[in-house]
Regions:
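C-terminal/domain-edge helix-coil "capping" segments
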Residues: 15-49, 147, 154, 167-277
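Extracellular loop and loop/strand-boundary signature of outer-membrane beta-barrel proteins
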Residues: 126-127, 161-165
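Short alpha-helical segments and helix-capping/turn motifs at coil-helix boundaries
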Residues: 1, 35-39, 123-125
């Protein structure tokens, strides 16, 4: 039995060497994107890009992280406006106009005008400053829901102090995007999408006496938590795709090629329907 325990210890030690431990010296990379990003950049091209404004895309959930030491940490990222703007740009269907930092932009333009009024001042913006562009469509919405532990589960077994277990947890983040006609205030279309955030843990261990006064204790575990910002970005990417597809179906905008509606990505999202619980 003693030799069997030592053999088990060697096996578990060998497994521990195969665990993919992140390298703390890794260089910064571009933000990771989900599978919906591939669909976003594979859409048919538009007949003409649409000028849109995004004033605010905020967290409307009021949810905080459940950890006792994180009472002031929100459950979802607070940079929703930046993520939505990125998705609109990546789709190549829209020209987002700066509105979140509008006050900063207006202040900078005042500085330019003040410099232009002085004859002896050198201006790098010429003698005239063009007007700001206006949007045809306003994109409204926000992060409307964050549900924790919508699914949980696990399995485990232990015999004579030796065994293993695994468990998982699923959360869900939901976003809403609305396209609003600037001239009339009419809501042209509205889309709500959800993305599941999966976390799981696998562990194994042994705790038993292998001989008189000789105790064997071994623990091995691995956890994986899907980053919330990537899940949120995927939900926003999907919402933008649905917004484009619904707009084409309703005649709000058109693809450059009429045959674009036969695009596999277009047909995939056009055929999606709301799930009925």
């Amino acid at each position: 039995m003693k030799y069997s325990m030592l053999l088990l210890l060697l096996i578990i030690s060998g497994c521990s060497n195969s665990i993919d431990v992140p390298d703390t010296s890794e260089l910064p990379t571009l933000m990771q994107r989900g599978a919906s990003y591939v669909d976003l950049i594979s859409l048919p091209k538009p007949q003409g890009k649409i000028y849109v404004s995004v004033y605010d895309f905020r967290d409307q959930t009021g949810q905080y992280k459940p950890q006792p030491n994180s009472n002031f940490s929100t459950a979802v990222p607070q940079g929703g406006t930046a993520l939505l703007t990125m998705a609109l740009l990546d789709s190549e269907w829209f020209f987002p106009l700066e509105r979140q930092g509008l006050q900063n932009l207006l202040t900078e333009r005042k500085i330019i005008r003040a410099a232009q009024k002085k004859q002896d001042s050198i201006s790098n913006h010429g003698s005239t400053l063009p007007s700001l562009l206006s949007a045809n469509v306003m994109i409204e919405g926000g992060i409307v829901a964050y549900d924790s532990n919508i699914k949980t589960g696990g399995v485990g077994a232990r015999y004579l102090g030796i065994g293993g277990s695994g468990q998982y947890r699923a959360d869900q983040v939901t976003v809403n995007i609305r396209a609003v006609d600037v001239r009339s205030g009419k809501i042209l279309t509205s889309v709500t999408t959800s993305k599941t955030i999966l976390s799981y843990e696998v562990s194994a261990g042994a705790f038993r006496f292998v001989d008189y006064k000789e105790l064997l204790e071994v623990e091995l575990g691995y956890t994986n938590n899907e980053p919330v910002n990537i899940a949120l970005m995927s939900a926003i990417d999907s919402a933008v795709i649905h917004l484009i597809v619904k707009g084409i179906e309703d005649g709000l905008w058109r693809p450059a090629n009429p045959a674009g509606t036969e695009n596999p990505i277009f047909r995939k999202y056009a055929s999606e329907t709301n799930q009925i619980l």
